[in-house]
């Protein structure tokens, strides 16, 4: 049975448009109309847009948000059905949500598959993703996006090539460090690869060796062997013989009108820097049903979405679709497509849905 990664383009995917067709006599031209019924309550209970401030890089910045004071929200996570997941970890000052979310998903899968409670290293995968990203940049002679972000299926692809290790074997933190911060690390990688591009220096072996030296300086050298239950093994042996994750069973879905439905194609966002075309494209109702049915049947789901919308607040721990943005009944395949097309909404964060 296939398990799923699901790429959610933004937080407005949860409600759909109902369709009705006008009745007409045979001689009349048939016209299909989309009818939307909006109740008085929905017009009254509108949300207010307000400006808030927060500190970004030491400076106070204004940003558009919502007034959440009148919104009723659940009082506790105990109100929800939850499946096993390890406690959430902070990615701190890194762009590695893709690894943290997907690693958490795979840990939940290990528990579901009766492999026990396992805590894997997110940064081990990040290390090799940065290496592969640099390799791609050199191979493409600089014609490739370069950032810390990536996609869910990068984790499974890097595991297939480099294996996996427990978090205890590789933290990605140097002695005395308590928080991840890849700002300086990635700046050094970017500066070096920019130098390569400007000087047309495309020696892949030497370039990757230098990038690894930067990574080793900031993250520590990843282990070539690890010890598990008294046995020494490589990261690939740990993945294949101990974890035994069915990595080929995990697939990506998206819902976009730019590609024919029921085909596979490329998810065109910067974080899909290697132009993976392994995304199954399905209509929005089936896309949504896949999420709901997975959760109802005991599977957790790795999601990609937009958390920079004004209806989302981490401080309030709440997410809504504000009425000043778009009424929920107007959200459908087309409105979603329009927002993705004009970049109002995009894919800027990965999360793990656990119930």
Each PLM stretch: what is its role?
Residues 8-18:
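Bacterial N-terminal signal peptides
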Residues 1-4:
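Positively charged n-region of N-terminal signal peptides that target proteins for export
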